[in-house]
Amino acid sequence: MLEMRFHARAGQKMEAAVELLTLAARAEGKYAQGFTKRSSSSKESSVRGFVRVDEQPITLNSEIEEPDLIVVLDEELLARREVTKGLKPTGIMILNTTKAPNQIREAYGCQATLGVVAADQIAQEILGTTLVTPPMLGAVIKVTQVVPLEALEPLLMERLGPVGKKNFAALQMAYKETVIQERES
């Protein structure tokens, strides 16, 4: 089973990423579950998302404490220890950043396999907005191959109509531009 945990700030529409990835996996004949949880403090509000995908029925129904994959929609969230907490030793972290993987390793002490993508820039260039959900989904698909990239296109078109084409283009660009650097020993 592939277990993924997403971290985002409120308003980044991470809930849509969790839902679309879950629906795409089901459309491909896999078992999938996804849900989100909001947490807020007096300073700021954040959202965590959880996705499980498997070839077998999923009987767990809980938050993911030890994910195979952590997806961070805002690099500033890495300053919080709980974001990377529990990542499996063979786990992967995908991050929205303009920095190279070695810069992330130096800044945050990350040893996991890293996938980095400039989702903010892709969203601005293609969508004319800061909505990073489509580019981040492209990065997730590149790193995990959990579903074919094309599995998202009909879902985006169904949900967004003509704007779905632009969202799929952002997803495709992120898929191509995501840089993966293997885990440091």
Please identify what each model-predicted range represents.
Residues 1-185:
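Active-site cofactor/cluster-binding pocket
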